[in-house]
Amino acid sequence: MGQTPSVESQESKETKNEMPELKSREDILDFFNNRSLSILLPMEIECFKSRLGDKDLSDPLTKDEFNTLLRIADSNSQLQILLWNFFLKISAFPFLSNRSESMTGFGILKGIILLTRERIKKYLGWSNAKLIKLIFIGLTSQEKVGVKTEASVFKIQHVLDTLDGIDLASSTVKDTDMLSFITWLLLLSVHCPTSNCKLNEKSLYDKWKDYEIVASSMVRSMNKKITTTGKGIGISYSDFSHTIVAVSKNVMSPLENIVEHMLYKQDDLLEFPCLDTFLKETKLMTYPLVAQLCTVLPNEIVMSQLQKLYVGRESGYSMRSLQSKVFNWKAATILLVSGTRIVDDIEYSENKNPRYKRFLEEYPKLKDEDQEMDDCHNLKKKVTFAVYIDEPWRVTNKNYFGEKRTSIIELSPRQDKFNSLKVGSVYFNTIGGGIGIGNNQPVTKLNSVRYAPGNVSLTLDNTLEFGVFRHTGYGGTIGPSELLKKNNEENKAFEIRFLIRDVEVWGCGGEKELEEQLREWKWEEAEAKRRQEINLKTMGEDRALLEMAGIIGQHGQSGGSI
């Protein structure tokens, strides 16, 4: 079998074409500023310029003007400071070790290109791996401002290849800054799902605290020492990038949407059906939780308009009730289960709930001394799991269902993902076996059941009162933790036993519905761009007018892509 190329070798190929040598920092900045203009369409530059009022692209912007461009709330000072510094660093590209002395339209335009996957690929030939590095650098604390590197000749290629000499291995991002950034992205994923949608700025930040709770789970995934943010624990690039790639691959998509939002005029923005128009929140399925699911699952989540099938609080906690509500749905579903971790089995079964004692007799639990629980699992009591099942439910007292895309997702206290390794990982057992994901079928007799948990599995008893998540590594139908694989800890053994508080099942649209929705959105975006072109032409003869207005063509020769 062939060898998979390393990230380093791939990145070296991306920028293999040598760049010119220039004699000053200012020349290099001008070079990349002008290159950014060549990547953008004239109509996009004109639309962005219209948002600056009477200012030129090279004029400094105030913090208030910057906040208006990015729709940052006046009340959120921490986010304002974080994003201001973030864009000052990005706008200094390629000199990332020092942030710009001022924020300009040129700097923001360059940021738009650098923070979108397709544009940065055209601009520099960089992959998503380099984009993640760039975002991480923007989030790091940086005290140096406008420090000029002493050199007689700058080799641009060397500056690009070394990211201006930044040592990523020793860089960290504050947990509080990461929490604000992830909270912002989650909020935008619901309110800014496309780059050309209208934003309701009055209510945009109303539920910030709710989104922050969800974001906390994602931040805990980036450093297992973090249980509560604000204790000064740093997040390394290695942990940050692994978390993004392994368990939250879509989390940066809203960043692309909000920066490209600046390339549309207000009149060209389209009404987009917000979640509150078709989703009535429940105890579990809230807008913040939908945002979290969107970071890890396919686009079916929001695009297909989730359908409430079963809510235990409304229909009663029973297998029969769940079956009557769910089994007629002929597409993918999301099972949500949340509860409180049972810390002391003996104390709880003898003093609080004698039914739990019987469950322990039926479920062969791991011994406490054989477990390695991370701090977030030891110290946090609330647990929430989602199971994405890409096949209709059915009674399976002997067999199994669930295609290869079935997966277990831990949503709290941290975010993690456990992927199906083979077809058939779910059972719905109506003769006392309950619901199992990753298990073997339980052995059921007249008045007893014996569960057979898999190495990685989620078990719900037949009364929907108790649940257990088990992790012991490879060997079953569900694969081990995507997070733990990074440090070769995929065989770490732990078990989360919990009292179920809520169970819900939600239907996702089928592939046909999703494809239709995607086609509609692409058509609407194309129409918006077409209207932009028409509006631009009504101003006069296209590019000539832009040059006369000083928008393009007066800042040197534009470069091509690398």
Swiss-Prot record:
GO biological process, one term: protein-containing complex disassembly
Location of the region described as Disordered in the Swiss-Prot/TrEMBL record: 1-21
Places the protein is found: Cytoplasm
Gene Ontology cellular-component terms listed: fungal-type vacuole membrane; nucleus
Entries under Pfam families matching the protein: TLD
Domain TLDc: 283-509
Residue stretches of biased makeup (Basic and acidic residues): 10-21
UniProt keyword Cytoplasm, yes or no: yes
Keywords: Cytoplasm
Top-level taxon in the UniProt lineage: Eukaryota
Record's function text: May be involved in a process influencing telomere capping.
Recorded family membership: Belongs to the RTC5 family.
Protein name: Restriction of telomere capping protein 5
Organism: Vanderwaltozyma polyspora (strain ATCC 22028 / DSM 70294 / BCRC 21397 / CBS 2163 / NBRC 10782 / NRRL Y-8283 / UCD 57-17)
Name of the gene encoding the protein in the UniProt record: RTC5
